[in-house]
UniProtKB/Swiss-Prot annotation:
Keyword Transport annotated: no
Function: Required for accurate and efficient protein synthesis under certain stress conditions. May act as a fidelity factor of the translation reaction, by catalyzing a one-codon backward translocation of tRNAs on improperly translocated ribosomes. Back-translocation proceeds from a post-translocation (POST) complex to a pre-translocation (PRE) complex, thus giving elongation factor G a second chance to translocate the tRNAs correctly. Binds to ribosomes in a GTP-dependent manner.
Record Gene3D superfamilies: 3.30.70.240, Elongation factor 4, C-terminal domain, Elongation Factor G (Translational Gtpase), domain 3, P-loop containing nucleotide triphosphate hydrolases, Translation factors
Species of the source: Janthinobacterium sp. (strain Marseille)
PANTHER family listed in its UniProt record: TRANSLATION FACTOR GUF1 HOMOLOG, CHLOROPLASTIC, TRANSLATION FACTOR GUF1-RELATED
This protein's name: Elongation factor 4
Source taxonomy: Bacteria, Pseudomonadati, Pseudomonadota, Betaproteobacteria, Burkholderiales
EC number: 3.6.5.n1
């Protein structure tokens, strides 16, 4: 066991985490040169295209060190994005060490810091590595100073390397072996294995990726999953060297996979403890929690007959994404669809993109909302994740909205514009500190302001240099109202939005104006109104198309013309009573594009 090292790589997006992993795998001969491809651990197309890691992957590698011994290095690849922070914390608690990869030309970024603090909290040994040292703009001294100042670990011996050219990758592995402690654990104790990740395979069912803490596991053992309390018979165990290779046993300190013919992913939750049914462990490993969705949106098929197909696709996605929640929803405007819950905006985009790409769905998505706590007059509390479910204002005592703590990092020159943006979004500044050329801001902000477009705006005001991460703090009483959109005095439920009262006038007006551009002219007048309760706060009209009924009158009496005009007017009035307005697809997206000026 002294020759095992379990480690993961912490890095911000684009700091070279996947490339470094590729080099390490190549150096240890995990894959032959023929099988090697860029970003070998990112298995989904979307992961490759966006250059992000979504699911955790592992590789068990054999490395012959300079001291002549052969070490078994287990690389556990973690997601780097803040939406997936729970998965990151599970991956990290399966390791004894982590490589902190920092781009020598850019310095420390927000998500690196967030994940690095998680690692230090879990007692993981952090080994700093400076990547992209071959770039002409690389400034190692500055990067080292930033690591020491922002994160507070000694970086004087940080390894310099370039994952692209392969320079210094061996030094990275050597420092890993000397600095990271071997795993502790007792191979004879009752089995405890942490589920780091799980996914669904069409042939064998659920594959669980585990780190064995104590005990030994063999095929034909009966296992018990402690959180879901289900029992299964182990069919095979093994390791990934990215390729899966079956083994006879998995013992304490090792990282590998278990296949036990489990049919649904709900049984194998990330962070759960696997133990033997015949000799269970006294208690589960700490840190397990159910993942709660934070952001909600309605997904509706463009064609009504696609509803069943959408349900099937969501079921298949759910097999591989335990955090995705969905329930059927009916909207008067959009027909049948689903209300889906996501971990965050990136998660939502990925799910949408996978539905469109892998399952060929055409979707309409409503504006994302967060969960509000609504206290009614009779003292009961409702959790509302959908504007159309908001009760009547007369019954509401108060509405509480989720507040998050946001950590922002940016170069000094952008501080002003970022502070302005945060104030616009109802942020309250809690702290501000300078670290070299970097500034760290801490804000408390309503989550509702973040889910719409905060991230995009932050990137554009800071030219892409600012980075952020956020975590939920509490529910806080707030003056938010529901704005309904009425078309010809009928409410359209899919267009309702929940906004702060201060912004409600502006938002209502802006959405109405946008709708006016998007709804095509009909044969009759269309009135678009925004209302809070019974108060109309704005109105726009789409003028009717009309035929020139006077074309056939040359000269002649005015009463003749008036008669024709009156007749046309009466016809339009009748038409308006029975006519229904087709709302085009773009109108639903209009809500997302209304900027808070």
């Amino acid at each position: 066991m002294n020759n095992i090292r379990n480690f993961s790589i912490i890095a911000h997006i684009d700091h070279g985490k996947s490339t470094l992993a590729d080099r390490i795998i190549q150096l240890c001969g995990g894959l032959s040169d023929r099988e090697m491809e860029a970003q070998v651990l990112d298995s989904m197309d979307i992961e490759r295209e966006r250059g992000i890691t979504i699911k955790a992957q592992t590789a068990a590698l054999m490395y012959k060190a300079r001291d002549g011994q052969v070490y078994n290095l287990n690389l556990i690849d973690t997601p780097g994005h803040v939406d997936f922070s729970y998965e990151v914390s599970r991956s990290l608690s399966a390791c004894e060490g982590a490589l902190l990869v920092v781009d020598a030309s850019q310095g420390v970024e927000a998500q690196t810091v967030a994940n690095c603090y998680t690692a230090l909290d879990l007692g993981v040994e952090v080994v700093p590595v400076l990547n992209k040292i071959d770039l002409p703009s690389a400034d190692p001294a500055n990067a080292i100073a930033e690591i020491e100042e922002v994160i507070g670990i000694d970086a004087s011996e940080a390894v310099h390397c370039s994952a692209k050219t392969g320079l210094g990758v061996q030094d990275v592995l050597e420092s890993l072996i000397t600095k990271v402690p071997p795993p502790k654990g007792d191979a004879t104790a009752p089995l405890q294995a942490l589920i780091v990740d799980s996914w669904f395979d069409n042939y064998v069912g659920v594959v669980m990726l585990v780190r064995v803490m104590n005990g030994t596991l063999r095929p034909k053992d009966k296992i018990l999953l402690m959180a879901s309390e289900s029992q299964h018979l182990v069919e095979s165990v093994g390791v990934f060297t990215p390729k899966s290779i079956s083994r006879d046993t998995l013992t304490a300190g090792q990282v590998g996979f278990i296949i036990a013919g489990i049919k649904e992913l709900k049984a194998a939750k990330v962070g759960d403890t696997v133990t033997l049914a015949s000799r269970p462990a006294a208690e589960p490993l700490p840190g397990f929690k159910e993942v709660q969705p934070q952001v909600f949106a309605g997904l509706f098929p463009v064609e009504a007959n696609q509803y069943d197909a959408l349900r099937d696709s969501l079921e298949k996605l759910k097999l591989n994404d335990a955090a995705l929640m969905y329930e059927p929803e009916v909207s008067q405007a959009l027909g049948f669809g689903f209300r889906c819950g996501f971990l965050g905006l990136l998660h939502m985009e990925i799910v949408q993109e996978r539905l469109e790409r892998e399952f060929d769905m055409d979707l309409i998505t409503t504006a994302p909302t967060v969960i509000y706590e609504v206290v009614l007059r009779d003292g009961s509390i409702l959790m509302v994740d959908n504007p159309s479910k908001m009760p009547d204002p007369s019954k509401i005592e108060e509405i509480r909205e989720p507040i998050v703590t946001v950590n922002l990092y940016m170069p000094q020159e952008y501080v002003g514009s970022v502070i302005t943006l945060c104030t616009q979004k109802r942020g309250i500044q809690m702290d501000m500190s300078y670290h070299g050329k970097q500034v760290k801001l801490i804000y408390e902000m309503p989550m509702a302001e973040i889910v719409l477009d905060f991230f995009d705006k932050l990137k554009s005001t800071s030219r892409g240099y600012a980075s952020m991460d956020y975590e939920f703090k509490e529910y806080r009483s707030s003056d938010v109202v529901k704005v309904d959109m009425l078309i010809n005095s009928e409410k359209v439920d899919a267009l309702a939005i929940i906004v702060h009262r201060a912004n409600s006038q502006y938002r209502g007006r802006a959405v109405a104006a946008k709708m006016r551009e998007l709804i095509p002219r009909q044969m009759f007048d269309v009135a678009i109104q925004a209302a809070i309760g019974a108060n109309i706060i704005s109105r726009e009209n789409v003028k009717a198309l009309r035929k020139n009924v006077l074309a056939k009158c040359y000269g002649g009496d005015i009463s003749r013309k008036r008669k024709l005009l009156e007749k046309q007017k009466a016809g339009k009035k009748r038409m308006k009573q029975v006519g229904s307005v087709e709302i085009p697809q773009e109108a639903f997206l209009a809500i997302l594009q209304v900027d808070d000026k």
